Amino acid sequence: MFMRTDDTGALARQPSGKPVRNSGDRFRPQGTEASKWKQRAFSVVKGFTTPLLPEDFIDLVDPLKTSTILRGRVQQIVRETEDAITVVIQPGRTWKGHKPGQYTRIGVDINGIRLWRAYSITSGPRTDGLIAVTVKALTGGAVSTYLHEHLREGQIVQMEQAEGDFVLPDNLDKPVLLLTGGSGITPAMGILRHTVGAQQDLDVVMLHSAPRPEDVIFATELHDLAQQGRLTLLERHTDTHGMLDPVELDSLVPDWRERQTFACGPAGMLEMLEEHWEREGRRDQLIVEQFRPKLVEPGEGGTVHFTEIDKELECDGARPILDIGEEAGVLMPSGCRMGICYGCVLPMREGAVRDLRTGEVTQALEGDNVLVQTCISAAAGKCEIVL
């Protein structure tokens, strides 16, 4: 239910006699006859809609115009590869824009549960205000599977403001190297399209890894840019040549040490790159974005007890507590779902969890209240989570 902040409709007064307005007020400052008439008209409408506000009815008619919740309307769905689609979205009026390389979180309702996932914004500069995200279908991925199989043009999705530090520095004075693998190409494509659209004279080399040529997302556009001389493109097909070994960069990109490098892809690839740049003493020239946590062998699992709502779930050792909880209808805080933002952190009063990225086990004795990231933690025995 929606409720007004002031059921009497009266406004508090400052010592000067002027109304005090809070964030819930929908009025403009008084001063002209026109604004007074608007205020009176609004008050009349407000009387008819109580206890809702007029804006709540606007939300029903046009959900993109609400000032309280950010949503987007799907304008177009484009098939990129067999398992990748690009979704073009018209964000609501409260969208604050984004920097190339950032991501937005998209929320959809699946079986009565709202699930969120982070997707990189892949569109370049546009005059129509639309943005695009590119989604690769993941085996067992609830949201990516839903978007591929059920999303339709015209559908409304939940959104959050853009986030992320995988962006070009404002004062960049070096040539650029983009090292990407699989769907890790998506934030790099957002950067690349921006530099091309803005007519920036930037020396860019992209080395992209994918299993086969037909698995390369944006392949046609990348090849066109390479033919135009806007990009030096190197493709590595891992089914044939295996994963990239960083030592190969000396022959593939001889001047890589002079370039600012942006890397995004599987965790194993990023770990090797970080170690290589560290050994070379150039770690500050490498910016990484991990789009999917690296999982280790499943543990034994256990019973998770959410103490405040008194609900117990049997959790295996292969999946995050967050995912299992949401599927069971438990409303849990969440964020990036990659172990980066700490938006999912909850206190563990007692028990043990295993970090799915590293295999490290975190334990809590009775009453400890150890903070755990539920998006990358699996049950490693019985545990109690304060929620």
Q: Over which residues does each language-model region extend?
A:
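FNR/FR-type flavoprotein reductase catalytic core
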Residues: M1-P29, K36, T145-D310, E314
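Short, low-complexity N-terminal leaders and the immediately following helix N-cap/first helix
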Residues: M1-A84
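Short flanking/linker segments adjacent to small metal-binding domains or redox-active Cys/His motifs
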Residues: D239, D316, S377-L387
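A short, sequence-level motif marking secondary-structure junctions
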Residues: T122-P125, D316-L322, E360-Q363, A378-A380
